[in-house]
Amino acid sequence: MSNVPSNLKYTASHEWMLLNADGSVTVGITDHAQEALGDLVFVELPEVGAHFDAEKEIAVVESVKAAADVYAPIAGTVTEVNQAAADAPESVNQDAYAAWLFKMTPDNVADLDKMLDAAAYQAVADAA
């Protein structure tokens, strides 16, 4: 069973989000996603300063068996990327929640209220 921390918000496409004290949002892929992909070998991160609409491709993670797009969970501007995750993709396998991919400033922080909570995401992951 996947680890689904209760303090995060989730998407049905297996991204997690954490609202930070400064109003930014940290984003990564879920434990379920990294388990399904297997050993990650490549992480492509977005450009800092780039704006993305919700549900648009923002990053790519590749494993030995598949490549998967990572989608912007909400509309916003990328403010920081986790270069350590790109330099060591296996870190995402080791701890998907510590090895975040990027941070963004949301266009509308209220959009987070539309995301799945841990229980709802667990139901999605269990059905996958």
Swiss-Prot record:
Lipoyl-binding domain ranges (all copies): 24-105
Gene Ontology annotations for the cellular component aspect, listed alphabetically: cytosol; glycine cleavage complex
Pfam families for this protein: GCV_H
Cofactor note: Binds 1 lipoyl cofactor covalently.
Modified positions (N6-lipoyllysine) in chain numbering: 65
InterPro entries, per database record: 2-oxoA_DH_lipoyl-BS (IPR003016), Biotin_lipoyl (IPR000089), GCV_H (IPR002930), GCV_H/Fam206 (IPR033753), GCV_H_sub (IPR017453), Single_hybrid_motif (IPR011053)
PANTHER family found in the cross-reference section: GLYCINE CLEAVAGE SYSTEM H PROTEIN, GLYCINE CLEAVAGE SYSTEM H PROTEIN-RELATED
The family this protein is said to belong to: Belongs to the GcvH family.
NCBIfam families, sorted: gcvH (TIGR00527), PRK01202.1 (NF002270)
Function: The glycine cleavage system catalyzes the degradation of glycine. The H protein shuttles the methylamine group of glycine from the P protein to the T protein.
Entries under HAMAP family matching the protein: GcvH (MF_00272)
UniProt protein name: Glycine cleavage system H protein
Primary gene name: gcvH
